[in-house]
């Protein structure tokens, strides 16, 4: 295994050629302030203790690493373990990062938060920590996403957040990020931008990765306890890439195959997909250089996925770098493949995963049978499927897949 891999951003915020700080001059003071504050917090044992206290007492960590006996048997290959991020408070991995950044904002003396959300999971996690720490929160959410995720909008409002509909562009996550960045520029004195994925200008990709790395660190100690060795393969779904980078990061220098599963939407041969790595090319969006779905003229294209949490047109800079050096292998799953995996997995394990997580399971169903019964796969179940019930119900009804 190549030990020369760059695992931290350089002083300009780049991983290889990806990352950086492509932001208006007016935002640089805030970025510099954040970078300095984060560096200090990271080195402060008291900050780490406080973070660990809330992760344990409030979020409910550590989450289990569950052996999926029935699912393993049905696939007839490698042993499959599930990293249960669906069991966190609020039902997904998003809370790990929201909590960490809220503590950081509090430390910086910021009384207000602004966030973007797509599926609403990051919005709910942000609203949750804002309520916990008595902070104001404005959430920008695309008007299309608001229609798809009414329940999460209500949850955010119940928790005390103000949800602002974004009509511009296609009314999805990408447009919400634009609005949140604009808002931050004009409220920078008292507001922290609680970015939800491992992207945006440096130091955000590093901050989000560090707060999500609790996933991979736990996997490592748990699998060593259960199996006495590291897994052969680790699989996670990828939108912007925060659950995946948190899962992969502690294993980057180990001899473990890492698979990120992108959303192929209606198929990689259509223009309705979210394959930033699979069909994209490097470009700049939302303050960072990364792989993007764009046309020849560099216009960012609309990403599509049945899962609102994966339809982002980019993938974070660290993933972009790991792709280029061949450290992480990027696979994909279509809407249909993900939904079929979701239905199959649920029947075997009695766990209803988020549609995002089902993309990872779809690849596990292809990978496991090619491996031996001694091999070990860990797959991150990034969230639970409660938010997706209506989508799943519609999908099954349209295809006559009612329960027999």
UniProtKB/Swiss-Prot annotation:
Identify the coding gene. Answer: trpB
* Reactions the enzyme catalyzes: (1S,2R)-1-C-(indol-3-yl)glycerol 3-phosphate + L-serine = D-glyceraldehyde 3-phosphate + L-tryptophan + H2O
Known partners and oligomeric status: Tetramer of two alpha and two beta chains.
Source organism per UniProt? Staphylococcus aureus (strain JH9)
Coiled coil located at which positions? none
What name appears for this protein in its UniProt entry?
Answer: Tryptophan synthase beta chain
Give any GO molecular function from the UniProt entry.
tryptophan synthase activity
Please indicate if the UniProt record lists Amino-acid biosynthesis as a keyword.
yes
Q: Which domain of life is it from?
A: Bacteria
Q: GO terms for CC?
A: cytoplasm
Q: What does the UniProt record say this protein does?
A: The beta subunit is responsible for the synthesis of L-tryptophan from indole and L-serine.
